[in-house]
Amino acid sequence: MVCFSPRHDLTLPEMEIKDIENIIHTWQKEYTDLGNIDYINHVQIFENKGSVMGCSNPHPHGQIWAQSSLPTQVEKTQNNLKSYYSKNNRNLLQDYLKAELIKEDRIVIENEHFVALVPFWAIWPYETMIISKRHINKITDFTADEVTSYAVILKQLTTKYDNLFKTSFPYSSGIHQAPTDGEPHEEWQFHMHFYPPLLRSATVKKFMVGYEMLGESQRDITPEKSAGILREQSDIHYKK
């Protein structure tokens, strides 16, 4: 468990940039320390925020799990990234990001080093992904400027989430990056997913049931509309 702050009421959007940078430095250290253990091949950094996401401890915190095998979802992602890289000698997510930056209508936030967007395959109403602009395959490769830019975009995105329904916005978020198996993994690109459940208000959430559970997920609003709504939200937290 990684506590974000000594204060029980201080979540990411209400923290100072320097304090979010400290969290990122902790993530870097844990990724390195755990990854250096011989039998650890995957380090998963994530946060479950809010009781609706199953968070039983209200103190703002994240978690880190480490294991010898690759989780099924990560292994599937890696296989797709490797396949694209072997065929094109290019990074799939870098090419994807370039296409999104040209199209622009699914972009939520862009700064010098990172982009937050709503991916076209998103299934949650306000699902987003943060992708590094430079080819970085793990969090320990960040420069000092990239650490700051990452802290800024984390604060801005989570602030927009809170401002949307004037509530402490629940979500599950997590970082996907290169495995810690000692291989170079040029196919990987650092990115972070946010999966928030809220749909129309602070009390109305999307349910994955019925056809969506048995057949295929359905979108309640388009990725473009979702990105536009988030983009319009202020970078200043509604409590201020």
What positions do the PLM features span?
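HIT superfamily nucleotide-processing domains
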Residues: M1-K240
